[in-house]
């Protein structure tokens, strides 16, 4: 079938269950790429099979995926493992998009400002502006 793409481009936001095996995620990325889509993996920091494994993030990117993390996941103290992992993969240039996971304004409000302050130091223009603009225009990132 056809996937619902972003703004009529080849980009498609893909979400997996937190418990999905890495082999399932990897095969799905391959399938999307072979079908002509450009998958953006939503909130990869939640996937148990990927969390803490920079090598798997790299492999998914090399297979053709782009990586999106949630803004909330960047906001955490020094002992917050999720925030530490997200900051690490961002520092290594492995994050392409920042999302809010905001499904509505009553129960999940967007909280981009604190995360933007974390991102702003080095990657803000690319992650917050340039990559989303290029994606919406259907251009490569």
Segments the model singles out, each with a brief description of its role:
Residues 94-110:
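Short acidic/histidine-rich active-site segments
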Residues 1-3, 84, 139-141:
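Short, surface-exposed amphipathic charged segments that create phosphate/polyanion-binding patches used
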Residues 63, 93-94, 123:
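A short helix-to-beta-strand connector/capping loop
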Residues 26-27, 52-59, 80-90, 114:
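Charged helix-capping and loop-helix junction motifs
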Residues 75-79, 105-110, 136:
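Short active-site-adjacent structural elements
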């Amino acid at each position: 079938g056809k996937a619902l793409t972003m703004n009529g481009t080849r980009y498609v936001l893909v979400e997996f269950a937190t418990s999905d095996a890495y082999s399932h995620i990897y095969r799905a990325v391959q399938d999307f790429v072979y079908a002509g889509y450009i998958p953006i993996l939503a909130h990869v920091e939640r996937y148990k099979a990927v969390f803490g494994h920079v090598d798997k993030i790299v492999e998914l990117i090399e297979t053709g995926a782009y990586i999106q993390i949630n803004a909330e996941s960047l906001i955490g103290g020094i002992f917050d493992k999720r925030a530490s992992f997200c900051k690490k993969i961002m520092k290594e240039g492995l994050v392409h998009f920042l999302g809010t996971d905001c499904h509505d304004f009553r129960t999940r409000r967007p909280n981009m400002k604190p995360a933007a302050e974390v991102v702003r130091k080095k990657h803000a223009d690319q992650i917050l502006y340039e990559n989303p603009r290029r994606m919406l225009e259907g251009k490569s990132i």
